[in-house]
């Protein structure tokens, strides 16, 4: 699901208005896209899209963002953070971050957004649904949303 050309991160970035959205890694993992918004505007769009008020940020929320990168779920490790910076992203969004990544971002005034692991994968069912429909002509798909364990 993560290594799919229309993965969860690609869909999320498109939904907040990013243009020229492509995968972050060559294997189809993550996403990157162009925006022209303040960090705070992106935060509000993501908050509304994911129905999650528990978004945490690092960096100046008045900063103008031109390029955003995202990996849903637990993408806050060294490899993913380095890749976001390597492609020139001004903002990196994920569901979880390692503590030392947060500290590095704070020290360098790099913009990070932590949206929560569950919230970042809200569109999983839709992506899986689309993949299955591409491969099976006759299939009935039943979707089930269990809810965020942190918020009830």
Predicted feature locations:
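Active-site catalytic microenvironments in core metabolic enzymes, especially phosphate/sugar-handling
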Residues: 1-152
């Amino acid at each position: 699901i993560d290594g799919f050309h229309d993965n969860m991160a690609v869909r999320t970035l498109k939904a907040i208005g990013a243009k020229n959205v492509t995968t972050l890694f060559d294997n189809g993992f993550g996403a990157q896209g162009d925006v022209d918004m303040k960090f705070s505007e992106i935060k509000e769009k993501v908050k509304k899209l994911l129905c999650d008020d528990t978004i945490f940020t690092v960096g100046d929320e008045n900063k103008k963002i031109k390029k955003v990168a995202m990996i849903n779920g637990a993408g806050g490790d060294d490899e993913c953070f380095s890749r976001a910076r390597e492609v020139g992203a001004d903002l990196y969004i994920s569901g979880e971050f390692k503590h030392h990544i947060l500290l590095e971002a704070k020290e360098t005034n790099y913009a990070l957004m932590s949206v929560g692991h569950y919230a970042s994968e809200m569109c999983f069912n839709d992506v899986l649904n689309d993949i299955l429909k591409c491969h099976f002509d006759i299939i009935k798909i039943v979707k089930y949303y269990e809810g965020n364990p942190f918020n009830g």
